[in-house]
């Protein structure tokens, strides 16, 4: 019986925390300005009307309204419709 664990076993045992990516607000949901709609790496979803894109490609609502997912020119887009600009 070996009294040492072996070369690799003591070097294992690390993992990174999940990044919590994905869609945060779904189609038809009413949102306020500034709410995060999608967290993503790269532009899986592109910003549509009244939606901004952050430095890490996060999509956020620029105005209040309802979330709408669509396709434009073969790209998935996220827009805010029925917004009340006050």
UniProtKB/Swiss-Prot annotation:
Under PROSITE patterns, the record lists: RIBOSOMAL_L27
Spans through the membrane:
none
Region Disordered, as annotated, extends over 1-21
- InterPro entries named in the record: Ribosomal_bL27, Ribosomal_bL27_CS
**Keywords annotated in UniProt:** Ribonucleoprotein, Ribosomal protein
Q: Which GO terms describe its cellular component?
A: cytosolic large ribosomal subunit
For this protein, the record's Pfam families field holds: Ribosomal_L27
GO MF term (any one): structural constituent of ribosome
| SUPFAM superfamilies per record | Ribosomal L27 protein-like (SSF110324)
Q: Which GO terms describe its biological process?
A: translation
Q: Per its UniProt record, what NCBIfam families does this chain match?
A: L27
The Swiss-Prot or TrEMBL record describes its family as follows: Belongs to the bacterial ribosomal protein bL27 family.
Put simply, this protein is called: Large ribosomal subunit protein bL27
* Lineage, top ranks: Bacteria, Bacillati, Actinomycetota, Actinomycetes, Mycobacteriales
Which gene does this sequence derive from?
Answer: rpmA
